[in-house]
Amino acid sequence: MKFLKVALIFSALSGVYADLEHNLRIHNDIPVEYDSDAASADIGSEDEPHQQEPKIANFLIEYDVLEEDGRISSGLIEVENGKSLSFSYNFTNSEDADVNVYAFGGSIIDMGSSQIIADIPRTDFSPVHVAINESARLLQKLPIDLPEGILYVLPHIYVDKDGEQMKVGASPISIQVVPPPLSIFNPQFLSIQLFLLGLVAAISYYVFGFSFKTTKQPVKKQNRASNSNEWLPETHIK
């Protein structure tokens, strides 16, 4: 009897082992794709987080606005719409290699909303070579055709370093855009002048014309009467 129980247990264990071996063979037939690059990246990310450090451009950009005569007490530069601002740059290269400066650009920012309301179109010019620790003078003309108010001007300078193109921003300035003075030759102003002159002429004719007629007629009759009496004898004058 004991032998029969042992035989049954042994047969059950043999079936479980055979089923387990069959399952293992089936799973071993499944191909597994292994990405060594991804694995190494995952391992690297687990050991030390990957952080991309921002590049810092070693350039010194200083500039003057040649129209600073329009600077008012609050520090703003007042400029009329339709005029231009001239930026005189002093660009210093503190990088470890020579660079070429080849374009201007920038943005116009509204002071109230801090939103970009206009872009300064990129203006390319012949590349200016600037060696290490050397400086170069650059001049930019910025036509002003903007909404009136207080705005920020953020200039950009485009630099090429060993084939790598960079856009470097300079410190912003604040400007106040005002309307241009109204010229006497402005068509709108001339039309207003003509309208006012016509209005004054019409009023003058209406007021002085009627008063002149009412005062002039009796004078004419009196003159005629006096002239006619001078030629009559005194006996006929009544």
From Swiss-Prot:
Residues 213-238 are cytoplasmic. Residues 219-238 are annotated as: Disordered. Keywords: Endoplasmic reticulum, Membrane, Signal, Transmembrane, Transmembrane helix. The chain crosses the membrane at residues 192-212. Its main location: endoplasmic reticulum. The keyword Phosphoprotein does not apply. Residues 1-18 form the signal peptide. InterPro entries: TRAP_alpha (IPR005595). Disulfide bonds: none annotated. Residues 19-191 are lumenal. GO terms for cellular component: endoplasmic reticulum membrane. It is found in: Endoplasmic reticulum membrane. The keyword Transmembrane helix applies. Is probably involved in a pathway contributing to genomic integrity. Belongs to the IRC22 family. This is Increased recombination centers protein 22. It comes from Kluyveromyces lactis (strain ATCC 8585 / CBS 2359 / DSM 70799 / NBRC 1267 / NRRL Y-1140 / WM37) (Yeast).
